[in-house]
Amino acid sequence: VLSMPFGTKLPFDHSLVLEGVGNAANAGVAFSRLGLKAGLVSNVGEDDWGRDIIRALKKQKVDTRFVHINNDKVSNYHYVLWYKEERTILIKHEEYDYHWPRFRQNDVPKWVYFSSISKNALPYHDQVADWLEDNPEVKLAFQPGTFQMEAGVERLKDIYRRTEIVFLNREESVMVTGGSYEDLHDLF
């Protein structure tokens, strides 16, 4: 349990600001560093933070042509609180108007890594699922975020159906499969 009195100042060890992070951005950077062609479909706000994110991704050789800058919006900013081996992430997704891009034929990726987006983006999942249906050669890796887990397997069944690789921790695996936490094999 995280508990702190309001109205006080709390000391901390240090802080570190990282631009262009999150599940999908991290994956894009990792793939680029491995020498693979990587791009990011994402949204940022029309602010310094959004420009810093795009600049950081370009520096890592991640294609940012499909990063949409949302006018009059701010960029997502999350806080990670670390204590020993444990962490808590304070999240807030901005309410962007999500649209899956129209790729030119030579820009269609071999793989899509789909991850956490905001609560209001459920219709966006349908756009992604429809696009995947129209592009059966494209493989999908899926790491559901907080709001996708809340939406449930039934609502996202078209995404799960097309998923080649899913990334879940044990608790999430129980939620998705209905299996037993104690029986790891039951979760596959």
State what each model feature region is.
Residues 41-46, 65-74, 188:
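Beta-strand->loop->alpha-helix junctions that form or flank phosphate-binding loops
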Residues 16-18, 42-43, 118, 146:
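A generic secondary-structure micro-motif detector
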Residues 20, 46, 121:
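Charged, low-complexity surface patches
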Residues 76-78:
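Glycine-rich phosphate-binding loop of ATP-grasp-fold ATP-dependent ligases
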Residues 23-26, 49, 74, 123:
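Short glycine/serine/threonine-rich phosphate/pyrophosphate-binding segments
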